[in-house]
């Protein structure tokens, strides 16, 4: 009689899990929770329960693989539900900002990290993002000049977006690694 696959083996064999943890540093990959969202309802599905503070999503419709601290999970849940309702990017951003201001969802803590990967050659392949709510370039000594084009050439440096707002964050392109240089491993 053939043996049924154990849930752990089925999880390990799911290619979405390997894809989802791709942007993470090696020491965070094995313990990351992996979730996916139903496109029509926004409902969360846990593909693998993790043991650390990181949660990842396989490639979404926008082409990005994302990982983030679990403190951001309610924000991602809300985003998934709004996208299932066919809300525009601006409507999603505005709703999340309003919910954060109202205290319905928590703002990320200063220094909270997120990780993003894309295999689209018109996007930065490997990008780490540090949340710095309400910070300004003067407070941190960081540029606000986008390094996107330089990062696409493998020469990007960090820059701040949305300075002085609760959504302020520093974009950190990761250059000269096998993954950022186009290797899929």
Predicted regions and their residues:
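Primary mode marks residue(s) on the alpha4-beta5-alpha5 output face of response regulator receiver
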Residues: 11-185
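Sec/Tat signal peptide C-region and signal peptidase I cleavage site
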Residues: 4-11
